[in-house]
UniProtKB/Swiss-Prot annotation:
It catalyses: L-glutamyl-tRNA(Gln) + L-glutamine + ATP + H2O = L-glutaminyl-tRNA(Gln) + L-glutamate + ADP + phosphate + H(+). Its EC number is 6.3.5.7. Subunit of the heterotrimeric GatCAB amidotransferase (AdT) complex, composed of A, B and C subunits. Belongs to the amidase family. GatA subfamily. The active site is at 61 (charge relay system), 139 (charge relay system), 163 (acyl-ester intermediate). Transmembrane segments: none annotated. This is Glutamyl-tRNA(Gln) amidotransferase subunit A, mitochondrial. GO terms for cellular component: glutamyl-tRNA(Gln) amidotransferase complex; mitochondrion. It comes from the Eukaryota.
Length: 521
C-alpha cells in the first residue's frame, strides 16, 4: 500500500471515530501534507527515504507546541492560542519526513488520569463490545485512542506520573516513557518540570523504536536535556554492565517488587502479571523477588510535588502574558485584581484549580516543611530504592548509603534481598479500565489511585514501558465491584504490564517489552 493510501486510511478513521473525541485539531483533508506524502512515496520507490517515519502520520498531544496548529492544552484559557514555533520533538519528526496527523485531546494541562477534564469534552475509549463506556486513561488519552483506532501511525504524549503508560494499558496500545532528560521538553507546555517527559504511543514496540530514535537527541534549548558527554557516560555504563551480565549467561535477572502485590490488585491483573512472569521464566530468565519499601509513599509524594510545580508554572496564564482575557469587569472592581482573578477563574477548569490550590498550600510558609520538603525526601528514598535494586548503577548518582534505616528495616538486609536485577516487571494499573459512570461517582482521591504503579518510575526518572499482554481466555468474572473497573473486559482482550529499567537503560526496557509483546495467554 502506498504511503498516501495509508494516510488517507488514517484520515478516514479520524472521521469514523470522531465521536471518540481523540482529536482537538484533526488533520484537514486538503492541504500541503498530501504533496509531502507523495514526495515520501517517491523517495520510498527510489530507496532513499529520510527515515522509517517518512510519510507516516504521527499525532501530537495538544500540550506540545506546533506552529501550524493551535496549542490549547485542552483549556479554555488557551483555546485561541497558536505557538509561533514548533517544539523540538515536532521539528525532529518533520525532519524525518513524518506528517503531523493533528493535535490530540487530553486532560487540561495534563492534569488527570482519565482524559475527562478537557474544555473540548472527554475522550472516549472504544466500546464496541461494552455496554458502558470505559476510561481511556489519561492524560494522554487522545493520543492512545488515536493509535488504538488507526487514526494515526503513532502519537506523542507527555508522561508526568503515568500519563502515557496508563492510557496505553487501558486502550491495548504500547506506551513508552523514556529516561528523564533523553527527549527534549523545549516547546512542551510545563506541568511539573522535574517530572514531565515526552513519551511515545504506538501499536507495536517496533513503532515505538522508530519514533524514539527520531526524538532522542541532545537539545541546547532545553536545560534539562542530557548533553552529549553525559549520554556517553550513560552508554558506557550500560555497555560495561551488559558485557558483565551477558557472561556467563545471556539470560536476564528480572525483579518482581513485593510492594506491588497489593490487596486492591484486580484478580485479572494479578493473573496477567503471574502469566507474564511464568512466560519470562520459561524463556530462561531468572525471576527474583525484590523490595522497594518507599513505594508505598510514592503516590502521596507525587501529589504534593507535581501540584507544587504546577502552581508556579501555571501562574503565567493570567490573561495578560498568556491566555484568554476576561474584560467584563463590574464598575467598582479593582482593574488588575479583577482581571487576574476573573481570567483564571473562568479560563481554568476545576481539576486544574484544585491542583493549583493544593500546590500553593504545600509551598506556603506553614506547610512547606511538613509537606513539600517531606515529599522531596520521599522522592530521594524512592530513587535510592531503585538504585539498590538494579545491577547497573546510575553513574550520575552518588553511591547509595546502605547503613541507615527505611521504615524500620535495615538497608543492608534490603540490599541483600535485592541481589541486583536488570529490569522490573509489574502491572501498569491495579485494575482494568473503570467505567466512566463509576468515575463520576468516585472521590478525587480514588481517581488518583490509578497512578499508584506508574508514579514511582516517574519520581526516579526511570524508563518505563507499558505493553498490552494478550490474554486469551482470561475471564474477569468474579473480579469484584464493577464500579471500580474490575468487572470490565480488558480493552482489546489485553492487560497492561510494565517494564521498568535503570536510568539510561532504555534499550533494556524495550527489549523486555518485546519478550512480553509476543506472549499470548
Amino acid at each position: 500500500m502506498s504511503l498516501l493510501r495509508e494516510a488517507e486510511k488514517c484520515l478516514a478513521n479520524q472521521k469514523t471515530y470522531a465521536s471518540l473525541n481523540a482529536f482537538i485539531t484533526p488533520l484537514q483533508r486538503a492541504g500541503p501534507w498530501r504533496d509531502r506524502v507523495r514526495d515520501s512515496d517517491t523517495r520510498r520507490e527510489r530507496g532513499v527515504t529520510k527515515s522509517p517515519l517518512d510519510g507516516k502520520l504521527v499525532a501530537i498531544k495538544d500540550n506540545i507546541c506546533t506552529r501550524d496548529m493551535p496549542t490549547t492544552c485542552a483549556s479554555r484559557i488557551l483555546d485561541t492560542y497558536t505557538s509561533p514555533f514548533n517544539a523540538t520533538v515536532v521539528e525532529s519528526l518533520e525532519k524525518s519526513g513524518a506528517i503531523i496527523a493533528g493535535k490530540t485531546n487530553l486532560d487540561e494541562f495534563g492534569m488527570g488520569s482519565h482524559s475527562m477534564h478537557s474544555h473540548f469534552g472527554p475522550v472516549k475509549n472504544v466500546t464496541e463490545s461494552r455496554r458502558e463506556p470505559i476510561s481511556p486513561g489519561g492524560s494522554s488519552g487522545g493520543s492512545a485512542v488515536a493509535v488504538a483506532t488507526g487514526q494515526c501511525y503513532a502519537a506523542l504524549g507527555t508522561d508526568t506520573g503515568g500519563s502515557v503508560r496508563l492510557p496505553a494499558a487501558y486502550t491495548g496500545t504500547v506506551g513508552f516513557k523514556p529516561s528523564y532528560g533523553h527527549v527534549s521538553r523545549w516547546g512542551v507546555v510545563a506541568y511539573a518540570n522535574s517530572l514531565d517527559t515526552v513519551g511515545v504511543l504506538g501499536s507495536s514496540i517496533s513503532t515505538i523504536r522508530e519514533v524514539y530514535k527520531t526524538i532522542n537527541h541532545p537539545d541546547l534549548h532545553d536545560p534539562t536535556n542530557l548533553p552529549p558527554a553525559t549520554r556517553t557516560r550513560l552508554t558506557a555504563a550500560v555497555h560495561n554492565s551488559s558485557t558483565t551480565r551477558s557472561s556467563p549467561s545471556p539470560y536476564l535477572r528480572i525483579g518482581i517488587p513485593t510492594e506491588y502485590n497489593i490487596h486492591e490488585l484486580s484478580p485479572t491483573v494479578r493473573t496477567a502479571w503471574q502469566r507474564s512472569i511464568v512466560h519470562l521464566q520459561r524463556m530462561g530468565h531468572t525471576i527474583l523477588p525484590v523490595s522497594l519499601p518507599a513505594t508505598k509513599h510514592a503516590l502521596a509524594a507525587y501529589y504534593v510535588l507535581a501540584p507544587a510545580e504546577a502552581s508556579s508554572n501555571l501562574a503565567r496564564y493570567d490573561g495578560v502574558r498568556y491566555g484568554t482575557r476576561d474584560t467584563d469587569a463590574p464598575d467598582d472592581a479593582e482593574p488588575g485584581g479583577y482581571l487576574y482573578a476573573s481570567s483564571r477563574g473562568k479560563g481554568l477548569g476545576s481539576e486544574v484549580k484544585r491542583r493549583i490550590l493544593l500546590g500553593a498550600f504545600s509551598l506556603s510558609a506553614d506547610a512547606i516543611d511538613n509537606y513539600f520538603l517531606q515529599a522531596q525526601r520521599v522522592r530521594r528514598l524512592v530513587q535510592a530504592d531503585f538504585e539498590r535494586v538494579f545491577r547497573v548503577k546510575n553513574p550520575l548518582l552518588p553511591a547509595v548509603d546502605v547503613d541507615a534505616d527505611v521504615d524500620g528495616r535495615d538497608k543492608k538486609q534490603i540490599a541483600g534481598d535485592n541481589a541486583g536485577v536488570d529490569v522490573l516487571v509489574v502491572p501498569t494499573a491495579p485494575t482494568l479500565p473503570p467505567t466512566v459512570e463509576s468515575l463520576k461517582r468516585a472521590s478525587t482521591v480514588e481517581t488518583y489511585m490509578n497512578d499508584i504503579f506508574t508514579v514511582p518510575a516517574s519520581l526516579a526518572g526511570l524508563p518505563a514501558l507499558s505493553v498490552p499482554v494478550q490474554m486469551r481466555g482470561l475471564s474477569t468474572v468474579g473480579d469484584g465491584d464493577e464500579s471500580k473497573g474490575d468487572g470490565a473486559d480488558a480493552a482489546f482482550g489485553s492487560v497492561g504490564i510494565q517494564a521498568i529499567g535503570q536510568f539510561g537503560d532504555d534499550e533494556m526496557v524495550l527489549h523486555v517489552g518485546e519478550m512480553l509483546e509476543g506472549m499470548h495467554g
